[in-house]
Amino acid sequence: MVNIKYKSMNKSFDVIVIGAGHSGCEAALASSRLGCNTAVVVMDASKIGWMSCNPSIGGPAKGQIVGEIDALGGEMGKAADATFLQFRVLNRSKGPAVHSYRTQNDKYDYAAYMNDALVNQSNLTIIEDMVTDLIIEDDNDSPHVLGVHTKFHGELLSK
């Protein structure tokens, strides 16, 4: 069950993250942990942290990224450790330089873990809405994003 806390429906944020898949969750958590007032806009809050049909974390490529995210204080590795069903060392027949780790995870438990991490994070507001457009200011040949337009909440501004 998703538990969204609208701490306040402030429409001005330091950072706005669109989507709450793996990278959206990590981006929202990282910016809020750095003290930025952060919004994460999701179309369906029940899909926060939702894993694909192959619910695994790790492997030769993704395992490298997960390790780096973990070293920087990210949540993906913690969620994988808390919700794994199976743990494997891959490429055992080869040398230790190419060994990698992979977990198969319970996708429902993983999503619940990530939902709890976002809901309980200070400086983070979850907004269930659809981003329809970016607000872009073209200033002296240096365009930058000022915020987003959403279907139900209108304009959300960012720094």
Question: Where are the regions that the model predicts?
Answer:
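Conserved N-terminal/central alpha/beta ligand/cofactor-binding core
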Residues: 6, 12, 25, 29-137, ...
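Local beta-strand N-terminus motif with an aromatic residue
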Residues: 13, 157-159
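Glycine-rich Rossmann-fold phosphate-binding loop(s) that bind the pyrophosphate
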Residues: 20-22
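Conserved beta-strand-loop-beta-strand element in the redox core of flavoprotein oxidoreductases
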Residues: 135-157
